[in-house]
């Protein structure tokens, strides 16, 4: 989704905020996976859309990083030229980002004449200013392949103490993140032939980072504060400075890259770390011939850069050093937004190894793009690693998008669309004296506060907080509708009902504006249902932010809306199980499974004679008998865990360590439960708590009181802390807690001799994100997953 080129390129405008936004250039060695997408292009897209929403003059520049060893390696794998690999994967990346709705102003590439021109010009400046030196270095040479091995063509064990990762690349260890030289690896191997290379001398050019240290440190010290750098960026950069800057090689013994414009080194190319960040500049030069107005205009342009944490030193140390070394008036990076890693289920996403869900996979799931964007952004790993899981995606779609946001919008618009005498005939009603209605006034005050918090978060590039705040407005809207009882007001007090409905319709409009950076297709659909053109604006200059304090004035009376439609569809358990199975393992594993399935299908088709002899149910007669509970497989489906509410809790009259609770487990049933929680949870905190209750244990007498169920709680690893496992507050009392992928009816009563509970108990735990799980499957309700307050990696009993 790029500027189509018909409009004139944007240039900085004096007196306006001019913001240049870049995303780390994705490499063309594979299809981008979800971790790549949230770490770079999607996060930058949200901020770019926010800037446009606010009326700032912003451009978003990105493209594929195409030179270097990884491209040559991939070309060897696919038996084609590096240029063919780049053409193929550039098109794939573009298609994926278009599907995700990424709003680049220019999505280019680095294998262009413009890249060569800009890169060589910067090199010449560094050479003229004497920031470069020549040196002989030792490099690994493969006698079998008859060539020097670039960093990514070597793998071995990481040399750093405490790491020893056995698949470290020659340029960087993926596990500990440290940058390496290939000769530092222990037990190195050539990735092409798997033979052990030898060390050989070769001459190269280096940038003298130690000589630039004072200028660089002054820039970092000032800008990291004024630009509000993310903490992980500051920590990584300070670690580099603390460990001491070294001269860094900027040339490589390769063919695929920007040629070095120096007679002695004309057979070498620039190292990708030196070349790739310059790609931002060259891609901008493809966008406009007046690119210097963006890149050499620090007085009027703010540069915001987005990337994953492994790219930090190249953008806070290397690229600024290169710019400073030219002694030209470059626009240096002001703000850097860095993400940690997004992990996949039990392990890591890996583009090179093909592990995880990839950008081209998501189109085949039939899950809409707005759901993918929302899930990735709510799960954005801003300060620590986060994990993608199919059950969490399901919980967020069903519990947040469908039950909260979609429910609010559809409820409001559907009521307006009802015919006269049942609704408003699709016309926004007129409303008077909204300020005098206390519930409406209270709502407006909350919304005004939330919008201010949203703007503050987004200005600081705290995208996850901005999204969370916008969703709180939707929650307040749902509460407002429920508390107002508008369906009664429509019959009993039509003027007041008009106030409520017009105010709620204004909130729908406001939510579409606030959420456009995150879910543009959702916002376009809402505006379509409001019968409005998809033009989004939240400008201070036009007073649109102030309207948040008067939501009843956002939409004019007599405005005719369009046709309301459901905005989200529930994701079912069987779909989640199917996706989890489909995307298990690596891409090569999936291909092998598909081939095996196709082979099995072909074999089945050849067994026609057997099929004729055994016509499905021709002889058996009747349905198969249900399997006795005693013989069933032991899975979580056999447990009857329900959402309960403690209506009364008191000390056991005959045991100091026990509580006796009366718990509502739904259907009008109150059960007596005895729990050994006195040492861990104060009595006052037990009152009126939502809890998870195991209801099909055999009743047991505990000090003369029969306990009819068990309250589930988590304990810390040392046993010093215990917390209740709590369902979401909006979960229905009595509903069954489920475990996606484990379907079936529970046993009436668990047979103690079969040890069903004891078998399953060992795999009940809490995760880093405090979600209660069986193995990695969350305790799930219709309102979302069950959690504990603070115990991560705990055990549940």
Curated annotation (Swiss-Prot):
Location of region: Disordered: 601-634
Enzyme class of the recorded protein, top EC level: ligase
Regions crossing the membrane: none
Annotated catalysed reactions: tRNA(Met) + L-methionine + ATP = L-methionyl-tRNA(Met) + AMP + diphosphate
Oxidoreductase keyword on record: no
Family: Belongs to the class-I aminoacyl-tRNA synthetase family.
Name of this chain's protein: Methionine--tRNA ligase, cytoplasmic
Organism: Arabidopsis thaliana (Mouse-ear cress)
């Amino acid at each position: 989704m790029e500027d189509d080129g018909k409009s004139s390129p944007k240039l900085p405008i004096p007196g306006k905020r001019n913001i240049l936004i870049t995303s780390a250039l994705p490499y063309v060695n594979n299809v981008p996976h979800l971790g790549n997408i949230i770490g770079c292009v999607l996060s930058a897209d949200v901020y770019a859309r926010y800037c446009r929403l606010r009326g700032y003059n912003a451009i978003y520049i990105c493209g594929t990083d195409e030179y270097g060893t990884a491209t040559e390696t991939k070309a060897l794998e696919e038996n084609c030229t590096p240029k063919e690999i780049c053409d193929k994967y550039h098109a794939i990346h573009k298609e994926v980002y278009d599907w995700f709705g990424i709003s680049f102003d220019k999505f280019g590439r680095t294998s262009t004449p413009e890249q060569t021109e800009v890169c060589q010009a910067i090199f010449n400046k560094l050479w003229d200013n004497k920031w470069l030196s020549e040196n002989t270095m030792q490099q690994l040479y493969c006698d079998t392949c008859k060539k020097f091995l670039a960093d990514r063509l070597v793998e071995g064990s990481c040399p750093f103490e405490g790491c020893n990762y056995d698949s470290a690349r020659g340029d960087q260890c993926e596990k500990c993140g440290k940058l390496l030289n290939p000769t530092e690896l222990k037990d190195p191997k050539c990735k092409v032939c798997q033979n052990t290379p030898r060390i050989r001398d070769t001459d190269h050019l280096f940038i003298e980072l130690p000589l630039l240290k004072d200028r660089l440190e002054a820039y970092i010290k000032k800008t990291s504060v004024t630009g509000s750098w993310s903490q992980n960026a500051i920590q990584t950069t300070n670690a580099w400075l603390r460990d001491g800057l070294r001269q860094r090689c900027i040339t490589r013994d390769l063919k695929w890259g920007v040629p070095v414009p120096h007679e002695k080194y004309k057979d070498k190319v620039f190292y990708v770390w030196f070349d790739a960040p310059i790609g931002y500049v060259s891609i901008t030069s493809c966008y406009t011939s007046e690119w210097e107005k963006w890149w050499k205009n620090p007085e009027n342009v703010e540069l915001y850069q987005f990337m994953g944490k492994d790219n930090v030193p190249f953008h806070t140390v290397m690229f600024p050093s290169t710019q400073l070394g030219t002694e030209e008036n470059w626009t240096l990076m002001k703000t850097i937004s860095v993400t940690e890693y997004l992990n996949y289920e039990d392990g890591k996403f890996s583009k090179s190894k093909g592990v995880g869900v990839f950008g081209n996979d998501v189109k085949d799931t039939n899950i809409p793009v707005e759901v993918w964007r929302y899930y990735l952004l709510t799960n954005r790993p801003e300060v620590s690693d986060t994990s993608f899981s199919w059950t969490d995606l399901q919980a967020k779609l069903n519990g947040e998008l469908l039950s909260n946001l979609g429910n609010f919008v559809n409820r409001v618009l559907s009521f307006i669309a009802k015919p006269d005498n049942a609704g408003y005939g699709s016309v926004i009603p007129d409303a008077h004296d909204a300020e005098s209605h206390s519930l409406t006034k209270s709502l407006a005050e909350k919304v005004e506060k939330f919008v201010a918090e949203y703007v503050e978060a987004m200005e600081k590039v705290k995208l996850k907080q901005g999204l969370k705040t916008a969703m709180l407005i939707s929650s307040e809207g749902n509460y407002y509708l429920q508390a107002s009882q508008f369906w009664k007001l429509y019959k009993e007090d039509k003027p007041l009902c008009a106030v409520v409905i017009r105010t709620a319709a204004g909130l729908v409009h406001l939510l579409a504006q606030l959420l456009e950076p995150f879910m543009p297709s959702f916002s376009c659909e809402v505006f379509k249902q409001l019968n409005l053109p998809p033009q989004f604006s939240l400008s201070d200059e036009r007073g649109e932010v102030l309207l948040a304090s008067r939501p009843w004035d956002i939409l004019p009376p007599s405005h005719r809306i369009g046709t309301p439609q459901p905005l989200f569809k529930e994701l079912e358990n069987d779909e989640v199980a199917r996706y989890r199975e489909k995307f298990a393992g690596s891409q090569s594993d999936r291909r092998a499974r598909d081939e095996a399935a196709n082979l099995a299908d072909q074999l089945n088709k050849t067994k026609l004679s057997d099929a004729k002899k055994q016509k499905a149910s021709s002889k058996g007669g009747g349905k198969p008998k249900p399997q006795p509970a005693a013989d069933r497989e032991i899975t979580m489906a056999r447990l009857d865990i329900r959402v309960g509410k403690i209506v009364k809790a008191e000390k056991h009259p005959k045991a100091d360590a026990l509580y006796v609770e009366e718990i509502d487990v739904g259907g009008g049933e109150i059960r007596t439960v005895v729990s050994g929680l006195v040492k861990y949870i104060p009595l006052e905190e037990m009152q009126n708590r939502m809890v998870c209750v195991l209801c099909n244990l055999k009743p047991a007498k505990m000090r003369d009181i029969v306990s009819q169920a068990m309250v589930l709680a988590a304990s810390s690893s040392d046993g010093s802390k215990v917390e209740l496992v709590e369902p979401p507050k909006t979960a229905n009392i009595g509903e069954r807690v489920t475990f996606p992928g484990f379907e079936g009816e529970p046993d009436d009563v668990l047979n103690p001799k079969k040890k069903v509970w004891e078998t399953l108990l060992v795999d009940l735990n809490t995760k880093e994100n405090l979600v209660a799980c069986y193995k990695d499957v969350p305790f799930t309700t219709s309102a979302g997953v069950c959690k504990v307050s603070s115990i991560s990696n705990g055990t549940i009993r």
